[in-house]
């Protein structure tokens, strides 16, 4: 959603690191609910999503946390990637998220990490974790205005360097 905290974080990251990488966004809400029965059917949104991931050099998932987990739409999107040609297989992958809560999106990131390491996905997830921003109403407001403190920029930079080597 374009007004969500995590969408704003994703936009910030794409602007901040535009000289190191090209970022492409995909609206996963356009994907139909996953069903193995639909794998044989042609679906332009699913095909475009799978092709985008397949052609990407790396993938960054920016996720909120709902009920201590990942949003259903993201899990649905990952189901579409769990079949040939296995677009996430050994693909450099990072997780990021922002939240107003004390733990940020840590539980969602842990859950997403487990899913991304599943045998059908086997993404090359950054081993030292992703980028997590928590308890930070003022910090989020600054990020939304592109006035982030140095430690936030350095933290994001050290996480994203994984992709730019």
Task: Mark where each language-model region is.
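Helix-loop-strand module that forms the ligand-binding subsite of alpha/beta enzymes
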Residues: 41-120
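A generic structural motif
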Residues: 18-24, 122
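A general structural signal for well-ordered alpha-helical segments in protein cores
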Residues: 6, 10, 46, 74, ...
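N-terminal beta1-alpha1 ligand-phosphate binding loop
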Residues: 1-20
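Secondary-structure boundary/capping motif
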Residues: 2-5, 34, 69-70, 104-105
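N-terminal beta-loop-helix "entrance" segment that forms/cooperates
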Residues: 28-44, 139
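Hydrophobic/aromatic beta-strand patches that form the interior of the parallel beta-sheet core
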Residues: 24-26, 94-96, 126, 131
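Glycine-rich phosphate/pyrophosphate-binding loop and the adjoining helix
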Residues: 124-165
């Amino acid at each position: 959603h374009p007004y969500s905290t995590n969408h704003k974080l994703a936009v910030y990251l794409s602007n901040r690191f535009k000289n190191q990488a090209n970022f492409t966004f995909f609206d996963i809400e356009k994907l139909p609910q996953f069903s193995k029965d639909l794998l044989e059917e042609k679906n332009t949104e699913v095909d475009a999503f799978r092709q985008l991931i397949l052609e990407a050099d790396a993938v960054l998932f920016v996720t909120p946390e709902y009920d201590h987990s990942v949003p259903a739409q993201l899990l649905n999107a990952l189901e579409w990637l769990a079949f040939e040609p296995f677009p996430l297989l050994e693909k450099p992958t990072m997780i990021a998220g922002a939240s107003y809560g004390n733990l940020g999106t840590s539980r969602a990131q842990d859950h997403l990490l487990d899913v991304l390491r599943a045998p059908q996905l086997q993404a090359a997830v950054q081993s030292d974790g992703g980028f997590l921003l928590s308890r930070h109403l003022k910090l989020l407001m600054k990020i939304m205005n592109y006035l982030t403190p140095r430690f936030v920029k350095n933290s994001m930079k050290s996480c994203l360097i994984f992709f730019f080597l």
